[in-house]
């Protein structure tokens, strides 16, 4: 390796201008590619693509599109939300006019008209059918018309009241809405068709965007459109301290997540760069030009890395988005070692050629070994099926090698260029000592206590290993604070805790069979509700009641027809209108005809009725192309327990072929074993590869043991600390273990390589010479990864915390335990 590195030194010394021009051209090209990279924030982009549980869930999303909906929330502090119906109407109309929106649902009376109006008795439960029977009697008609008159004469009457009374003078809508409000277990109130909470605090408008939440370009335009519409509505309605507007729903979360991660990535990149360079300058007190060279070297490597990432993947996901902070912390290590040695040699000799050859021949082998082991460990993560960790491993592995190449060629070329411009322009002695002398004295005076302390620490850590836990709750990787989720909790409090649903789907070979299966499913859903397994549900029955319920309604309609004279009912209606001062409008004839036709229904509706219905919400429950139906099952208090999920899975299996149960809770539960197993395999592969590389470098098993001791002990201490403190793994930070194998091995490599080169037989002298650089490498790594702890998404933040703990543990082991072990073991030989 030394021969090759010396040749690199000669190449750099003789062709530094060519190298810099070539590197600059390549950097310009890759920088242009960086601006094309998309940042995907959907958690599905970080999960495996070929897992049955995920495939079923993704199929559900593709078939029913339930994830792509937005909820606009109007809130009234004074519980006067019905004062804002006109605002809701104005908002609804503006939303309908937008090209970004497929449809809007804010008033149930404005949707599902064709089927519902013609066949409304089929949608009524038993109590509502009895109410219909009473409403159509002579007494019922007279009572309702008198109530209409009283309402219109009231000083609180609104234009909307007049319109509703004109359209439906018998107020049959109240009967229909009462029946519909009983379909779920939530506390939704439907007043004049609007979706409001029963405490009169909230009103909801449901929006279906025209594009997917995974289409980043569309999401940006859609977000601007929604903001514009809401602002226009506020200005039109005027400022009102009682009124608040907000966004909720999966689509709102996707918009918020994209904005949050994008902002976090930019801030984190800037923060990590500043921390690394401030730390570098504080410790080494280099001239400003050295900072420029280090910055150019790192940014060149980062540009190459992200350019290749675009060519390979085209985008970054939630996990791989942190690669900038990682490379800032790791890449500076190679610069520190090579430049410091170059500076030291130049100060002693004054010869630039010698000062370049010596660090490349003597120091660079350890740097190359460290970089290769680090990248190999990162590449080991590709053995996992989780796309987030897989992508992170490849990009980070490429990035480490890019930092190495950039250091060996770009940094050294810049050093030669600057020194040829003016000798002594870069190099100066000085810098912080980090208390290295004190550490050396401790190692010299207390070797045995250090050994015993290390053994005790490892023993305590091993005890903690038994308490390591994995959190498979999606919230463990979600945002720390989210306005969307906070509003979702408010909605749950006001409307009932209908969130975190499981989805059950049924498919059949034809419509007739699907209708039968749908009826079976509805009966079982009612049974599950009675058993207390579920708290509520939403299903196709909102648009098409099961056939057996329709038949029950048809039988009741027969009884109503027998009890009423339809012609007499119309005469009573017209007479009562005149007696109360109403004009008998021509449209009332059509109105009464519609009622008469509805009462004369003799056959139940089939799925064909849905396919002729223009209500877009039906797609959430019925896919006519694939002949699939879906129902949404809601848990008690918004959270599923393991026993309920297992019982529902067993019940679903008992329903037979064609029924499938899915949901995020099921999906993540099924992935837990997989991610743990694959992470252990990746870590084992990383350890084996690292061991082989270390052996090729040092050519002795005992030396391999010594070099790897700080890594093994540091990882054990980290895991034990997590177990003892209750810190849990999740789907993102579990990748930190494999990353730590690649990061922590470097410290042992640097210490032992320095020992071999200097032939220092005392452990304190090893620390005296190499300790400062090792501490600085650890601190810059902490600056890079530690900055992740400030990010909003818990998964990424916790990964930064785990790696920071691991780096500190590996550093302590390398600085204290390794020199003492070197002293004892090498002295014996």
What residues fall within each predicted segment?
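Juxtamembrane segments of multi-pass membrane proteins
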Residues: 447-572
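Extracytoplasmic
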Residues: 157-282, 286, 519, 589-690
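Hydrophobic transmembrane alpha-helices and their membrane-interface caps
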Residues: 288-338, 703-751, 786, 816
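Transmembrane alpha-helices and their membrane-interface boundaries in multi-pass membrane transporters
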Residues: 311, 328-343, 363-364, 368-383, ...
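Solvent-exposed, non-transmembrane loop/terminal regulatory segments of multi-pass membrane proteins
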Residues: 34-78, 181-194, 440-441, 449, ...
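Pore- and gate-forming transmembrane helices of large, multi-pass membrane proteins
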Residues: 347-384, 708, 760-791, 811
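Signature of alpha-helical transmembrane segments and their immediate interfacial
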Residues: 1-41, 413, 417, 421, ...
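Alpha-helical transmembrane helix bundles of large polytopic membrane transport and channel proteins
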Residues: 86-203, 240, 244, 532-613
